[in-house]
Amino acid sequence: MAGSSRIGFMAIAVAFHLVYILSIFDIYFVSPIVTGMKLFGVERPHESPKAPADRLVLFVGDGLRADKAFQAHPEPYPESDQDLVPRHLAPYLRSRVLEHGTFGVSHTRVPTESRPGHVALIAGLYEDVSAVATGWKMNPVNFDSVFNRSRHTWSWGSPDILPMFQHGAVPGRVDAFAYGAELEDFSKDATELDYWVFDHVKDFFAAAATNETLNTALREDKVVFFLHLLGLDTTGHSYRPYSKEYLHNIKVVDQGVKEIVELIERFYGDDRTAFVFTADHGMSDWGSHGDGHPNNTRTPLISWGSGVAAPELHPGSIAPGHDELSSDWNLDHVRRHDVAQADVAALMSYLIGTEFPANGVGQLPLNFLSASIKEKAEASLANAQVILEQYRVKEENKRNVELRYQPYGQLSDGNLDPESRISHIRSLIEAGSFEEAIEESDALMSIGLQGLRYLQTYDWLFLRALITIGYLGWMAYATTTVLSLYVVKESMSPQRTLLGSAFFLSLLVALYSSFIISKSPPAYYLYAFFPVLFWEEVYARRANVAKGFQALFGHVKSGGAVVALVFNVVLYLGVIQSLALAYIHREILTGLFVLGAFWPMTQGISFLRSHLFLSMLWFFSCLAMSTFTLLPAMKVEDIPLIMAGGGLMTFVGLAYLVLEDFILSDVSSSKTKLKRLHTSRTLLGIQVGLIILAMLVTHSSATSLQAKLGLPKGNQIVGWFVLVTSLLMPLAYRLQPNSHYMHRLAIIFLTCAPTFVILTISYEGLFYVAFSITLLSWVRLEYAVDAFTQEKAKKQATVAGSQQHTPSTFRPLSLSDARIALFFMVLLQSAFFSTGNIASISSFSLESVSRLIPVFDPFSQGALLILKIIIPFFLISANLGVLNKRLGVAPSAIFMVVLTASDVLTLYFFWVVKDEGSWLEIGSTITHFAIASFLCVFVAALEFVSAAFIAGIEVEDTKSAALTSASTKADEKVPPVAGAE
């Protein structure tokens, strides 16, 4: 098998994890969209054929939180003491709530991003979570929507939102007027985006006065106007939702809505227009969105105009619907009607009299309607028919591909089938039992939605079992490979039997046959292939497994040794479990670093005396690392902290320049030193200079952006120059190569330092320095411990005939190497979580990338974010590569052990994924699984990065090389104590 080699194993590891990451899409992210449904709308009597409204205007304040829309705040830009008195910043919208319409909170689902939010509002369905990846660029909404059902829709706003509804609708039905992407400049005043929309709407209606064709089209019924207002989202990202800029933007939106409403009412003069104001998602206090935090999922919903109910007032008392959220809105006497975001699409369809969107799952909010109880009953029935029609089509599709289909119980019995229920509701309406009909329709919608979920999750049990067996098989296979390559001295060939091969082949054929009959997706075949492959390989190499365990545990015979082994196993499993919990509670890493700081003390007083400085450096670097996970993960721009981090990087670089001869003196000849003074030191000085230049340009750019002066072009050019030049600097060292590992690590540190200055917004630069020092002290300390242990063992050895190992061979892995793998795992997790968490990564602050790319460009900005995230991982890979070489361990050995152990985390997160509960819990558990899976892939990639970083380095001084070549010990090369530091 290919996996029996190092390269083959890594290739299989990457392929397996990439394929199994896709399993999350086949389990949790299956698209709910089906085609072939009949359309349903409210059937109106011939004597009153008109819908409640002839036209509808939809305002979407992108990124507007519910609380900020209704709370009172001081004037954002006060000009007098009176302006400091809190007042409501959206008085016009507030007047709609108090006097003209119905209001509430629209609750979104995760991901709280623009595309999923607009799809829920306009199409009435919740796209699978993976749809967020398609929301940044034009991807048509290839399913039904309110716009598609309308006679015509005109829309104004962002080029990231409008085209996807235009291209996904019937050709010619939706007109989109979008500004250029260059206007989405995070360094400029984002209210210009909203002014652009309002001004172009005004120009549009003005043109209708002289354009007869346009005027005629505007006066048709079933017309929709969509105004997408992006200013609030852009301002929130740049300045946070509690900033004066965000609050001022609310005033701009409120005034603009007022002017557009008055314009439309003057143009038509018939009071036949309905208005809906809402948002696609909210905004966290840190200027981010994407996760399921309540600040992101709660958005305002205000509707007024033709067909909309007047406010339900309760003078002198607290009206129903209010809770702690709305306690400071001063709207306690007005009933609050909360809805799910998809319900808004059903509301809009009803108001203009179109069919409900075919894929809609929203439930019509009857409290928003100014209609008779009979009309509400008929509308509710039509709403239920939409959902049941989707169930019918989905069930038919599933029944056609399943050998033994099990229908959903509540919709399968003869007396309870959908057709019978609908007939019963119709009879209730005809009998005048409207309230009962509404209740039955609500119950039927609820059952229909449950049935849709049943079909959506029909294959979950089988897939979860298959994926679990696959991960267990991978871990067993990886363990077998590690034992064969790096523990067993003479690996045996696979021992396959005819019966065993027939069993595994029959199992694979049976699974594939079921997939063919069920018309399963192609990925299912790979999900089944890997576990069969892995377990067959483990079975074939069972002899190597037995020999490997004997080599590792054969010496554990005494009771004390068994107790020590059990204690270490429990301890290591506890640390791994702690790493899993650290995904949720970053503070756990603080505890692990504090515990790790005392590790040298476990080696005894003699070791501490010999390596006091190194032990103290490790102790204080661990304590420094422990502080970062106590700091806020969601950060705001802090220029002094950025400068402090850059200053520390500069200090480290200058210190190395001054002490370079002392650090490298044991491997360098006088001739080499002289050359280094003229070449290497010059390059080191340039790298330090780039850090200083990065600090200067970052300070200037950040100050200019904070003052809303935009990003100076010169700063942008210099910033890119520093970023690119610093990353290319290692190539210049080919002029005078220096193979000492300390010199190589110093180059890598200085190479990445300017990037961390330019792309940091707070304490990340300080973390970079502390993390680098921790890694270096870890490498030297592990080598010192290994040398100390081997020297001690050599003195106590009673067997003289030990097997010889030359410096050119790799020693086998031992149980003590599990500690190295465990430290590597902790450092790997801290590289990600010390400066952030899931939410801070998914919705990162724009201050850093706007210093290089001020205009909205998600892929380029995302690439810069990824660069910043992966730099600490590069540092880890380089240091582990050095450590492997110093210890005489094969380059891939520790990486492969970590790759195996990391999947304990992956499988744990797979098991705890939730599909019920709050959307924050659901989204977080899915994200945890995805990140754990990608980290496993990343570990495999880091092995090759490490090989590139440490190519040609020297890790031993001349004295230690001589000693090492003469040392002997069974199964291990014995490094000398001298040079351990």
From Swiss-Prot:
It comes from the Eukaryota. It is an enzyme of class 2 (transferase). Keywords: Cell wall biogenesis/degradation, Endoplasmic reticulum, Glycoprotein, GPI-anchor biosynthesis, Membrane, Transferase, Transmembrane, Transmembrane helix. Signal peptide: none annotated. Belongs to the PIGG/PIGN/PIGO family. PIGN subfamily. Residues 1-6, 486-496, 541-560, 609-611, 660-681, 730-744, 841-862, 914-929 are cytoplasmic. The gene is MCD4. GO terms for biological process: cell wall organization; GPI anchor biosynthetic process. Pathway: Glycolipid biosynthesis; glycosylphosphatidylinositol-anchor biosynthesis. GO terms for molecular function: mannose-ethanolamine phosphotransferase activity. It comes from Gibberella zeae (strain ATCC MYA-4620 / CBS 123657 / FGSC 9075 / NRRL 31084 / PH-1) (Wheat head blight fungus). Glycans are attached at N148, N211, N295. Its main location: endoplasmic reticulum. GO terms for cellular component: endoplasmic reticulum membrane. The keyword Transmembrane applies. InterPro entries: Alkaline_phosphatase_core_sf, GPI_EtnP_transferase_1, GPI_EtnP_transferase_1_C, Phosphodiest/P_Trfase, PIGN_N. Ethanolamine phosphate transferase involved in glycosylphosphatidylinositol-anchor biosynthesis. Transfers ethanolamine phosphate to the first alpha-1,4-linked mannose of the glycosylphosphatidylinositol precursor of GPI-anchor. The chain crosses the membrane at residues 7-27, 465-485, 497-517, 520-540, 561-581, 588-608, 612-632, 639-659, 682-702, 709-729, 745-767, 820-840, 863-883, 893-913, 930-950. It is a multi-pass membrane protein. Residues 28-464, 518-519, 582-587, 633-638, 703-708, 768-819, 884-892, 951-981 are lumenal. This is GPI ethanolamine phosphate transferase 1.
